[in-house]
Amino acid sequence: MHYPSLYTFAAPDHWRAAPLFTTSCEAFLASFKVWNSATAGGNICMSLPAGPMITMTVALEATYTLWAADGSERTVDAADFVTGNHENILGPGEILRRVNIPISALRKRHTHRRFTLTQLGRSTLFMIATQSADMTDLLLTVTAGTTKPVRFSFDSMPDAETLQQSIDAIPEAVWFDDPNGTPDHRRHLAKHYAEEIRIELSAGVRS
């Protein structure tokens, strides 16, 4: 699907997390020409840390169907597809054929945080959190600041210390280092935003 189609997609009202389509499209840094011709699948397969379609699909618990040259298919969790900066699990001749987002994920509450050095700059950190309608669990996805997506799943809302420890447990080698941010800066942002998200969703703010 091209970005303009996803950006303007009219989702059913009960897809509470559908605004993340627009949010993620807006996080895609490109020229007008590229933005209007780029595809969600292409962004995923480029497998760059700041790929917003990676962020969105991992946060929405998507699966990818991969199609091999011999016609065989395999289905993988979106969270397992990207393995590093510009690296993924695609084999020779294999393509991304389909992205499937479960309806159950689209019905969840959501919030996000994104940091850039400039207003229209590349993401230094992009985090999305979702929560079931009963407002007890938490699914937190960390991207852009890491070389591959990191997704935390909590059956119940964690306390502040547990959440901070989870961020600290991300291996040093996974934090991305480039002119948009050092690993220490990105870790600091992740811990700060994680606590903001925890407070927001714990308060029962509807989204």
Question: Over which residues does each language-model region extend?
Answer:
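C-terminal structural segment of proteins
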Residues: 1-207
